[in-house]
Amino acid sequence: MELAKKEYSKLELKQEVNISISNREKKIGNVSQTINNKAAGQQTYIITEKYTPPTASHIERSKVKEVTVLYRGSTAPTLASGLTPFHKDSLDVWTDWGVNDIPTAIQITNGGGSTVTPQLKTSAETLKQTMKLYPNAQIYVYGHSLGSMNAQYAIADLDKKDIKRISGGFFYQGPNIYSNLTPKQQDTVKAINALDRLFNFIDRKDYVPIGYGIGDPTIGHLIEVESKKAGMVEQHMWGGYQFDKEGNILTNKEGSLQLAKYVTAQQLAAINIMRTSFTKSGGGLSSSEEIFLDAAEALAITQGMKQTIQGEIRALKDVFDKEIENAEELWRDTLSDARDIGSNLYESEILAALAWGGATEPEIVIDTVQDCEKSLVEATKIEQEYDKLLERINEAIKSQLKTDQELAKQIGSMYG
C-alpha cells in the first residue's frame, strides 16, 4: 500500500523510490520513465532497480530483473479546477472523470459493456511496451482508484504467454471492471488468477469500489479490508484501513490467507534464487550458507503461518461477538416475555420462575461470554508461540551473519 501511495507523489526521473517496512527503509528502485499522456489522462511511473531509461542499450535493459508500474488515480476535482478557465488541473480532471471514470462506472452499473475508454487503452499499451523494453524483468503493477481500473485492464489485455511475468498486481479502491472485458480478456484473467498473484483491495465503506457483488468474478483475489469509518475523501484514500503491529493490512479471513500464501511464496522464491547464487561457482553450499538458508526458509514459512493465524483469530472474534450479541438479545427477549406473562408478579418471582426452568442470565449470557473468551485465549497463545519462534529464528539468522562476515556481505541488509 505504501508503494501504491507513491503514484500521487511528484516523482522525477532518476529519483530513488523508498518505502518504510518495519521501521526500515527499503529501496524499490529509481524512476526510469514518467508517462503523462495528456490526451487520455494517463499518468504512470516506471521504476527499475537502478535508473535504466528506454534509451539505454538493449544489453542494459536486459539486465533489469524487476520493474514496478505505478498507475496514478484520478485528479481530484476542486472548485478552482472546475470554475477557472485554463486551470492547471482542468484538463486532468476532465479526462479522468468526464472521459474515463464516469463512462466506465455507467457501464459497470448497467452490467458491463464493450466500450473501452482512452485511458484504459493507453494503460494497456504502457504495460506491454514496458515488458518489451525490459524483456527479462518480473513485473509488479500497482493502482488506486482510476489507477486500479488501469492496472486491472492492462493485465487483462496481455497475451496469455506473458502473464507469468506478472509477479504481483495490487489494486486499491477501484471499480470492478471484469464485466467490461471481452471474452478473451476474461479468459486471460482466469488464467492469471490461478497463479494467485493479483489482489484487489476494497473498503466497503468507500463508495468508489462498485461492481463487487457476492460471487461476482474479479480481476485478482478480492481482499475485503476491515476498515474504520472516516470522512468521504479520507475513506477513499486509504483512511479507513487498519493495520496489525507488523504493519499488515487487516482483512477478512480469506484475504489474510491469500496474502500470507503470496508473501510466503515470494520469499521462498527469493531464497531459491539466493541458493542458486551461492552454488553458481559449481561448488556445494558451505555449512554457514546451509544454516542461513534453512533458517530463512523457516522464517518465511513461520511468518506466513502467523499471518494466517491472525486472520483466523479476527474471524473468531467476529463470530464470538455475534454469539455474545445473540445471547444478550435472547436474555432480553426472554425476560421481556416473562414480564409480560407474569405482569402481576414481582421481579424476583419472575427471575425465580425463569431459573426453575434453567433460564438465567449466567446460563444464557455469562457462560457464552466465558466460553468465547476461553477459546480466544487459547488462539492468542498459539499466536504468541509463533512470535517466540520468529524471534528465535531471527536471532539465529543474525548470529550466523555476525559469525560469517563474507556471508553477511553477500546477503547485504536483507535480514539485518
Tell me what each language-model feature is:
Residues 4, 20-22, 32-36, 48, ...:
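A structural detector for beta-sheet-dominated domains
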